[in-house]
Each structure stands twice: as structure tokens, then as C-alpha cells.
UniProtKB/Swiss-Prot annotation:
The gene is atpD. Keywords: ATP synthesis, ATP-binding, Cell inner membrane, Cell membrane, CF(1), Hydrogen ion transport, Ion transport, Membrane, Nucleotide-binding, Translocase, Transport. InterPro entries: AAA+_ATPase (IPR003593), ATP-synt_VA_C (IPR055190), ATP_synth_F1_bsu (IPR005722), ATPase_a/bsu_AS (IPR020003), ATPase_alpha/beta_chains (IPR050053), ATPase_F1/V1/A1_a/bsu_N (IPR004100), ATPase_F1/V1/A1_a/bsu_N_sf (IPR036121), ATPase_F1/V1/A1_a/bsu_nucl-bd (IPR000194). Produces ATP from ADP in the presence of a proton gradient across the membrane. The catalytic sites are hosted primarily by the beta subunits. Belongs to the ATPase alpha/beta chains family. ATP binds at G150, G151, A152, G153, V154, G155, K156, T157. It comes from Pectobacterium atrosepticum (strain SCRI 1043 / ATCC BAA-672). Its EC number is 7.1.2.2. It catalyses: ATP + H2O + 4 H(+)(in) = ADP + phosphate + 5 H(+)(out). It is found in: Cell inner membrane. This is ATP synthase subunit beta.
Amino acid sequence: MATGKIIQVIGAVVDVEFPQDAVPKVYDALEVENGAEKLVLEVQQQLGGGIVRCIAMGSSDGLRRGLNVNNLGHPIEVPVGKATLGRIMNVLGDPIDMKGDIGEEERWAIHRSAPSYEELSNSQELLETGIKVIDLMCPFAKGGKVGLFGGAGVGKTVNMMELIRNIAIEHSGYSVFAGVGERTREGNDFYHEMTDSNVIDKVSLVYGQMNEPPGNRLRVALTGLTMAEKFRDEGRDVLLFVDNIYRYTLAGTEVSALLGRMPSAVGYQPTLAEEMGVLQERITSTKTGSITSVQAVYVPADDLTDPSPATTFAHLDATVVLSRQIASLGIYPAVDPLDSTSRQLDPLVVGQEHYDVARGVQSILQRYQELKDIIAILGMDELSEEDKLVVSRARKIQRFLSQPFFVAEVFTGSPGKYVSLKDTIRGFKGIMEGEYDHLPEQAFYMVGSIDEVVEKAKKL
């Protein structure tokens, strides 16, 4: 095990000099001898002359030139397997929940290659989420990748928590949650939410929150993914939740300049597409098991053409776009039914009836969107009878797309609802065909199935 010395510290980036014949490989983990604290560095570049440039996985406070650094001779390795369930870990796989050692039987390196072509599997099976707007407009595939896109404060984390609650309770498999650069409070809420709904013993939690150094946030997604890969390779169907993939990109941007790379568009790192690809290509399903991933994607300034969300789009099977405009109407989940897409919305996969209902809902909402300008200028009375009917149905559909969430019961005061796909299709089909034209539109707001609408209308 070779030993080197620190020769330069610039924020999260540390240069270490080793003997010429014992230079560490790129991605090797190094450990700094700094009193009782363990600090791990990861080699990013070899600069020549025995010098390597590394990213610190913890705070570089207290480091000084001349400190000894040991080469561990392998990449960062984290615990995998059942011992990680119900535990909260950091980027290095160390427990941070005060419950003692993980007691793992095996550790895996966080840098691994993606599965080869012949190992990959293709599944057309749908994953029911119990959320009407998602099941109808942008259905999820088992073993697929889903992105939740939204600006600040439109409900990405709440939507993700609801998805975890619904899928983890209805689906009996294991889940891995990687908190990448999000609020510590949300991580805490999330842990208690999982404990209260008794699914904590099926979830592994890996946190690298906002206050952590960039090296930590850059690698914590890989730590979570490695744990998910282990479950997949044991033949299980795993759920991988990443909140938030944008912070992964941002951490890369923070260290990129310190590593001496030229910035590209909007100041992002030049390796943006490659870094995203390395992570996303590993999140895949093989013939042994599947990884279904749900990733929250922060959209800077609500601009979907920003390089970070735009790069993420290319990797996804379904995109759920949360809209500030819909949130401002008080319709939650604030999913935009015209902007959200899914590869699964194909008559050969979801069936002709589901496909026709989804497209019918879209066309009614699109027509309503076009008529809004006329209504704003001339009023409803100037519309033809046919258009008046379209507007009335569109407003009912818009309200019926809202739904009370289990995880938001404390805010809304109304109990959460899980709606099966069959009931969802039946409800929207009925509205489109005019079966509920006689009911007032407020009866459709914040309910579960269409039967509740009828009950609610009787009380109005």
C-alpha cells in the first residue's frame, strides 16, 4: 500500500504526490491520516510526475500540506445486501442513523460497468401507481426509467414520496432511496414517513445532503445504485428513487472547474452528457432482475431546455412534467397532461381502450387551451354549443386529474386515495362520453374514483 503526501488543497480538490512507481489508478480511493477523522479522497486525474488530483468525499477543513495519504488500492466500496435495509448511510456506506454497524457480508465498488447487451431484458409490463393522472397519461413500465420534472416548489418530492408509499406498499419488493443534494429536513421527514407506513425494513436510504461537499454529492447516487444493482443481481425487482438528479449534475459542475476543465454551455462541465450516461446506463434491467427508477429532476428557472434537464430527457421511458401554472390553480398533483409523455402509451402495450381514453382526454384539454384566449376576450357566450360542451368537460377533467395524497394528509386534511387503473379509465371515459355532464364541476375536485364524484355531488 503506497503512501503519498498532500501538496495542494483547493476547496474540495486535493493534489497528492506519490512515488513515480506507485501512482494510484483513476477512481482509486485514498485515505488521509488526519487524527481521528477518516477522510477519503477519490483520484480523478493523473497530472504526471507522480501527482494525482483527487476529490474529497468529506470536508477538506483541517487538511494541510505534508499530511500522509494511503492508497487503498481499490475504488470506494460500500455495503450491499439485506443488511442495508432499514438503514441510513452516507456516500461511503457508513451508517449515519446511530444504530451501530451495518454488519454487511459483502462490499461492492461503486464504479462498475453497465450490463452488456446480451444481459439486458425488455419488459412491457405496466406498474400501477394509484395516481390517476400518471396511470392514465404517462404510465410507468416495470423496469423502466421515469423522470419527475419541475421547478422549485411544484411538488417533486411530495409526488415521489407518494409514489414510494403506493408502490412500496402495493409492490412487495425492495427499494433504494438516494438523497442527492436535497434538504436534510426532507430526508428526516422521509425516514419517519417510511417508519410510520411500516415499509422502512424494505428500504435502504443513502443520503448526501445539501450541506455536504460536492465530491460527496457527486458519488452518492452511485452508492445507492450499487446497492440496487446487488438486489437486482439476486433476482429481485428493485425500485430506485433518486432525489434529485440535477444536484448530481451540479456537484459535477462544482468540481469540474477546480479540476481545471473548461466550462461548456451555461457553465456546465464539458463531460455533462458522459457523466449522465455513465449513471443512467447502469440503471437498467437484466434477465435476472429489474430496476425501476424514479428520478426527480429540478428544472432551473422552469426552463426545460436547460442543458441539465435536456440531457436527462434522452435517458427516460416516461416523463412526468409538473407545471407551475397547474399548481397555481390549486390542482395537485400538478402534472401537465399535455407535456407528460410515456413510451408505454401505445395501444399494443396498454390496450386500445386505455390509449383512446388518454388521447381523448388530451384532445379535449388541448381544445380548451386553444379556446382560453377567446373566452378571455369575448366570454363563454360567444362559443358554439359544441365548444361550450368541450369547455365544460375539460374543466371537469382538469379537476378530476387532482387527487388527495396519503403523504399530504397532514396538509390537506382529507384522506389519501389509491385509484386502480380500471377505475381511472372508467371515470375519464364517462366524463368524455357525457355521462356526468349534469354534475357540478366542483364535485370532481380532490376525489378518488368517479363513484366519489357522484356521492360528493349529492351533498353539494
